[in-house]
Regions:
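Anion-binding (especially nucleotide phosphate/pyrophosphate-binding) glycine-rich loop
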Residues: 2-147
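Phosphate/pyrophosphate- and phosphate-bearing ligand-binding catalytic cores of soluble enzymes
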Residues: 4-5, 10-17, 56, 151-291
Length: 291
């Protein structure tokens, strides 16, 4: 176990902000975390989990033991008549993983191409784009408790997914009546994800309910685009809207699009008929924040 002192963090955040970690451990396995938690010197230290560094803004040096997640690996766990179940280590680059699934013939994540970050961070934010959210393809995850070192797994229900939200962004709710366990699982700062599994459905069906994608379909003159075509279009669209973080530091599209009632949407459209908006299954309407 090699812990770096005063480790530079500039390479590990997409804004390329110059800062240092009091100490940094490159985590290649769950066992690495368990060893550091059991260490009498490092175990009591505050911990800071770091993936791709695309959703953080460093305001100074990090006075904690930074756990830089570098758990790699991707594989097909099993195939059923209904789906491919694939698994990836938390340290895998998200976009590279999406590309790999397509190369292997497992479509279903193409709408989430080119989102910055790691596989392990994807459930934390419940990442989403162009009509698809991570929860739509999520099977389960493995994690380790940063207080006890105990490994555990969560299914979708226990992850508490919401719009760019999950239990990994919240603390536990208050205890129930009579000192019962907390009413809501909250894992912010208490867990590190080590692996994520995805359910990619068969047969595959294209998701095209966004104007940018529909425009690409018309330009290509195809009625049933392939997953690879959608992947390529998503990459083109995103590159046209956002600079490459390696060239110009940025955090990608991390903001939330506001949701309003149909009545509120109608009132706004009356004032700005060109407003980009999308109806949601629950009856509300999502507005394009970047409009």
């Amino acid at each position: 176990m090699l812990v770096e002192k005063n480790a530079p963090l500039e390479p590990w955040n997409t804004f390329h902000i110059v800062a240092k970690a009091h100490s940094l451990l490159r985590v290649a396995s769950c066992a690495d975390v368990q060893r550091v938690l059991a260490d009498p010197d490092w175990g009591p230290c505050p911990k800071f989990v770091l993936g791709g560094g695309s959703n953080i803004v460093l305001t100074g040096d990090v006075k904690a033991l930074v756990l830089k997640v570098e758990i790699m690996g991707r594989r097909l766990l099993r195939e059923t008549e209904q789906a491919y179940i694939v698994e990836a280590g938390a340290g895998e680059n998200w976009h590279d993983f999406v590309t790999w699934t397509l190369d292997q013939g497992y479509p279903g994540l193409e709408n989430l191409a080119l989102i910055p970050g790691t596989v392990g961070a994807s459930p934390v934010q419940n990442i989403g784009a162009y009509g698809l959210e991570l929860q739509d393809r999520f099977e389960s995850l493995d994690a380790v408790d940063l207080q006890t070192g105990a490994p555990f797994s969560l299914d979708a229900a226990r992850c508490g997914f919401g719009y760019r939200d999950s239990v990994f962004k919240h603390g536990a709710s208050g205890a129930g009546p009579g000192g019962a366990p907390p009413q809501r699982l909250g894992l912010a700062g208490r867990a590190m994800i080590t692996a994520v599994r995805f359910r990619l459905p068969k047969p595959w069906k294209a998701i095209l309910g966004y104007a940018d994608l529909e425009r690409k379909v018309l330009e290509a003159g195809v009625s049933q685009p392939s997953a690879r075509q959608i992947y390529d279009w998503i990459c083109e669209i995103r590159r046209g809207k956002l600079p490459d973080p390696a060239v110009l530091g940025n955090a990608g599209s991390f903001f939330k699009n506001p949701t309003v009632s149909p009545e509120q949407c109608a009132d706004i459209i009356a004032r700005d008929p060109k407003l980009v908006h999308y109806p949601l299954p629950d009856g509300s309407v999502k507005l394009a924040a970047g409009w």
